[in-house]
């Protein structure tokens, strides 16, 4: 699972900030399949990212959306997130791995549903 999640972590560390800049610093969830340019593809991937984040579970037991937004995008430490939920450090690490896995699965489903090709694979 760690290797599988490495691709998602790298996506949020390296690609997501670049996509945000390419989008003109706008958060969008609009898919435009008519724009076949490379920028259009990246715009759609960025929209897919936010569609996926909005579909993530966000309950006290599985705060996946909170973990992805706060840790992967806003760079809040897992320790600070864990303190919010009054749990131990291992709880946070386990939830983070589950959140990354859930993100990858839902992201692939969203890409197929919205016909955004080629599929982005997290290795």
Show where each model-derived region lies.
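Residue-level detector of well-ordered alpha-helical segments, enriched
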Residues: 7, 63-64, 95
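N-terminal interaction/assembly modules
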Residues: 1-59, 79, 87, 111-123
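Charge-rich, solvent-exposed alpha-helical interaction surfaces
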Residues: 11, 84, 99-102
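Helix-turn-helix DNA-binding module
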Residues: 74-91
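Short, locally clustered residues in the helix-turn-helix/winged-helix DNA-binding domain
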Residues: 54, 69-73, 104
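DNA major-groove recognition helices of helix-turn-helix
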Residues: 92-110
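Short amphipathic alpha helix immediately N-terminal
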Residues: 59-77
């Amino acid at each position: 699972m760690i290797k599988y999640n490495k691709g998602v972590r790298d996506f949020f560390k390296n690609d997501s900030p670049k996509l945000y800049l390419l989008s003109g610093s706008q958060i969008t969830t609009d898919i435009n399949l008519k724009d076949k340019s490379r920028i259009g593809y990246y715009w759609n991937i960025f929209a897919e990212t936010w569609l996926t984040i909005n579909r993530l579970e966000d309950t006290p037991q599985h705060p996946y959306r909170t973990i992805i937004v706060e840790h992967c995008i806003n760079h809040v430490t897992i320790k600070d997130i864990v303190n919010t939920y009054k749990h131990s450090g291992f709880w946070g690490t386990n939830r983070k791995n589950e959140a990354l896995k859930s993100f990858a699965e839902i992201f692939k489903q969203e890409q197929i549903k919205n016909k955004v090709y080629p599929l982005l694979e997290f290795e």
